Amino acid sequence: MTHSGQPAPLEARKCQSLIGRVRVPGDKSISHRALILGALAVGETRIAGLLEGEDVLNTAKAMQALGAKVERRIDDKSGIVWSVRGVGTSGFATPEAPLDFGNSGTGCRLVMGAVAGCPIVATFDGDGSLRSRPMRRILDPLELMGARVTGESDGGRLPLTLAGARDPLPIVYRTPVASAQIKSAVLLAGLSAPGITTVIESEASRDHTELMLKHFGAQIVSVSDGTHGRKISLTGQPELHGAAVTVPADPSSAAFPIVAALITEGSDIVLTDVMTNPLRTGLFATLREMGASIEESETRLDAGEPMAQLRVRASKLRGVEVPAARAPSMIDEYLVLAVAAAFAEGTTVMRGLHELRVKESDRLEAAAAMLRVNGVAVEIAGDDLIVEGRGRVPGGGLVTTHMDHRIAMSALAMGCASDAPVKVDDTAFIATSFPDFVPMMRRLGADFA
């Protein structure tokens, strides 16, 4: 069900082609971090291109509740700009009411880290989907740093109350899985701790927090272990300074029109300002291995983040094997990759997808169900997803989204090229990350009704 309690069903029908030039919304990961670090900095942070989806807006509300001044302005030159006047490291105030993050696990977990280093008490809550997701992996290192947790249900589930440490301790912490959220929570708490806080990863996760901490003036060093892992060390108690941030277009959001264009005959689309951070572009690498025509141009850097213009043309795809080591760089894109695999010729095997089971829904089971109901042969073997591509998808199925925005968008992308229409039971949760998805796809030529 949706936030309002009313489902918003939609049907995607086969279209002639997708043609046009668009900019997908600002990156959700960068948007969350820009708001949080702006709130922890001294002075004003100006953010252009912020994703104005429900998840990010809930983080903005949380920053206001914790004492920062957050305003949305219209600038004659830059358009919409968000201004954040921060309270400084450790400067958060105890909020008057629980912090409600809606459906956003990223916002909730990152703010837990920021609160853990402040001598305040805050209650964290969310919607039914977020309440079902485990938080214990975030809470364990924060408790080692001196934070205290009360009121949690099984597995550290929301709602819960977090009392930040009055004298936070620097720690050396080895993450149990490749998780940018765990790493970021520890680093944000480490801002308030004296000395060096260190996070060790056996598999490198997305590095947006490290890049943005540098942009705001923190002393942080990231060193490769010579294989796939990294060691990140942060010097605590810096004075962060407000900064200008331009949020690049979200590659996770770009994934849906990209795959839709690849599988829809005659398509030729251009996506501008897409983030091309190598720790976020596993999907692009995989699609190219499958034979996708994805061309980069007009590359540039902003706040340490690379971005480029992408031209995507319809392509004949082939099945491939996707190694488990690639998962951290495309963890949010496996659902739509499964759609591409269904239209490919041959078998695609996606390995090591255990983390998909603790997302907004059990995305591993959801991906299989989405394909099966539309006539695609698919199998789950342990944590692997195996898709038998036949070059076409019969379609005709009704996809249950389980309040998951990415299931809804993946199914609608599939319907752009399936033989029969694909129906989606509820699209309202798309607003959490991509409010303009349906009208933007219609502008490109999608037939949604």
UniProtKB/Swiss-Prot annotation:
Keywords: Amino-acid biosynthesis, Aromatic amino acid biosynthesis, Cytoplasm, Transferase. InterPro entries: Enolpyruvate_Tfrase_dom (IPR001986), Enolpyruvate_Tfrase_sf (IPR036968), EPSP_synthase (IPR006264), EPSP_synthase_CS (IPR023193), RNA3'P_cycl/enolpyr_Trfase_a/b (IPR013792). GO terms for biological process: amino acid biosynthetic process; aromatic amino acid family biosynthetic process; chorismate biosynthetic process. One of its GO terms (cellular component) is cytoplasm. The active site is at residue 332. It is found in: Cytoplasm. The keyword Lipid metabolism does not apply. It holds the Pfam family EPSP_synthase. Transmembrane segments: none annotated. It catalyses: 3-phosphoshikimate + phosphoenolpyruvate = 5-O-(1-carboxyvinyl)-3-phosphoshikimate + phosphate. PROSITE patterns: EPSP_SYNTHASE_1. Gene3D superfamilies: Enolpyruvate transferase domain. 3-phosphoshikimate binds at residues 28-29, 33, 179, 181, 332, 359. Phosphoenolpyruvate binds at residues 28, 105, 133, 181, 363, 406. Its EC number is 2.5.1.19. Pathway: Metabolic intermediate biosynthesis; chorismate biosynthesis; chorismate from D-erythrose 4-phosphate and phosphoenolpyruvate: step 6/7. One of its GO terms (molecular function) is 3-phosphoshikimate 1-carboxyvinyltransferase activity. Monomer. Catalyzes the transfer of the enolpyruvyl moiety of phosphoenolpyruvate (PEP) to the 5-hydroxyl of shikimate-3-phosphate (S3P) to produce enolpyruvyl shikimate-3-phosphate and inorganic phosphate. Belongs to the EPSP synthase family. This is 3-phosphoshikimate 1-carboxyvinyltransferase. The lineage of its organism: Bacteria, Pseudomonadati, Pseudomonadota, Alphaproteobacteria, Hyphomicrobiales. The gene is aroA.
